[in-house]
């Protein structure tokens, strides 16, 4: 209670010792656990799993009239119980390791990411992470031998990298009156695309799946610029919706597509699609909230909610008769903290977008060499080229774990390139 206004305040803190002495002297203090308002659930399981808000909200909304034991509480939370055969890790390991890995095939990504999606949705990803590391280790060999060549590979049958997406669309749709949309979901990993694909299937829509490679480092400034430039990105580019729109309009202007039939939308609604023949659309709703997710189950829940909002815009284009190409500028990966950069290390980097959780862009190659001289243990863990270095494995330059991007893990480098045509 505040004497000046008569208002009453309730403060929630992790520890009563955090309360200032003068406030504590006047306040009514009590210890409270979230389990106190979730009657009927096993308290031990609630404390054991420490579920996120989305799960707690689900439990609260499904109030019980009877008590659930530990196994029933886990099931209600969406956590897998120990005796469920679907999560026999030995069997899963055998199945995953038997997948023939073709890193240019959507079939490979679907098979691998179906296991990942199932694990994430049931909070089993930590138990499966060793398998993801194994697969990624094989992917790194592919990157070393093939990545640079993919950037200049012919786009006629399909784009192998994001800089070839627009050239492919242009070659596949030579008629200016063809209605074509590029639908970019910022930061969408392939397992998240499978969630979208399942939602489309409920509407009897079956995309033609392919994969495409993000630009490296897998950051928005470079990879999405390459998408909308239809060419290799420029370091001097300033990433914002205005410049992205400019790239989109300029690309089609050079191909003699009338400007009046071209449109670009950033995070808005699809409006009057029947007026245009080239529609560029970007939604950043996934990426904007991705970095705040404490684990992949949080990201799974976020994705479920965001895709419900995204799907109607896809349907507007579909109903307007567009051929829709759905892709992403990069994916994401759950990364483990290495450490934060110190002041000297930060001073060696470009100031704008040169250091993220998973990439470093140095002002000079000498600075890069010095960094690895001081941190020799990182040489094998990072892909180094020119003046940049990116994490190969699931680590980040942070003080705590986070979901992020910028490196060359297969979950952030391989993005969907899906085509939808109206039947």
Go through each PLM region and give its residues.
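…; additionally, a secondary subgroup of soluble metalloenzymes is captured
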Residues: 1-180, 187-324, 328-423
């Amino acid at each position: 209670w505040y004497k000046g206004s008569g208002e009453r305040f309730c403060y929630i803190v992790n520890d009563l010792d955090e309360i200032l002495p003068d406030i504590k002297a006047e306040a009514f203090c009590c210890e409270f656990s979230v389990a106190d308002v979730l009657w009927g659930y096993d308290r031990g399981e609630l404390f054991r799993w420490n579920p996120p808000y989305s799960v707690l909200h689900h439990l609260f909304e499904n109030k019980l009239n009877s008590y659930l034991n530990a196994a029933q509480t886990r099931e209600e939370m969406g956590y897998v119980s120990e005796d469920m055969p679907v999560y026999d890790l030995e069997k899963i390991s055998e199945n995953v390791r038997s997948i023939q890995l073709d890193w240019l095939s959507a079939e490979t990504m679907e098979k691998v990411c179906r296991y990942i999606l199932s694990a994430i949705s049931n909070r089993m990803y930590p138990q499966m992470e060793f398998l993801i590391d194994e697969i990624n280790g094989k992917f790194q060999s592919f990157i070393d031998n093939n990545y640079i060549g993919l950037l200049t590979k012919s786009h006629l049958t399909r784009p192998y990298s994001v800089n070839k997406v627009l050239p492919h669309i242009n070659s596949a749709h030579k008629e200016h009156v063809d209605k074509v949309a590029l639908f970019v979901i910022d930061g969408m990993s392939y397992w998240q695309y499978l969630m979208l694909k399942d939602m489309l299937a409920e509407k009897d829509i079956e995309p033609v799946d392919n994969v495409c490679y993000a630009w490296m480092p897998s950051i928005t400034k470079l990879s999405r610029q390459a998408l909308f430039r239809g060419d290799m990105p420029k370091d001097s580019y300033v990433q914002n919706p205005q410049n992205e729109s400019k790239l989109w309009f300029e690309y089609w202007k050079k191909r003699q597509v009338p400007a009046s039939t071209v449109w670009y939308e950033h995070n808005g609604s699809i409006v009057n699609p029947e007026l245009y023949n080239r529609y560029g659309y970007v939604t950043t709703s996934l990426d904007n909230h991705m970095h705040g997710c404490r684990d992949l189950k949080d990201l799974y829940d976020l994705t479920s909610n965001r895709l419900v909002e995204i799907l109607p815009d896809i349907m507007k284009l579909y109903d307007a008769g567009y051929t829709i190409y759905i892709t992403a500028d990069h994916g994401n990966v759950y990364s483990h903290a290495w450490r934060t950069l110190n002041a000297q290390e930060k001073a060696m980097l470009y100031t704008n977008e040169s250091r993220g959780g998973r990439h470093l862009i140095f002002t000079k190659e000498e600075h890069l060499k010095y960094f690895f001289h001081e941190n020799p243990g990182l040489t094998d863990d990072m892909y180094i080229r020119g003046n940049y270095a990116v994490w190969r494995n699931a680590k980040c330059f942070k003080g705590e774990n986070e979901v992020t991007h910028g490196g060359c893990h297969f979950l952030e480098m391989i993005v969907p390139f899906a085509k939808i045509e109206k039947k």
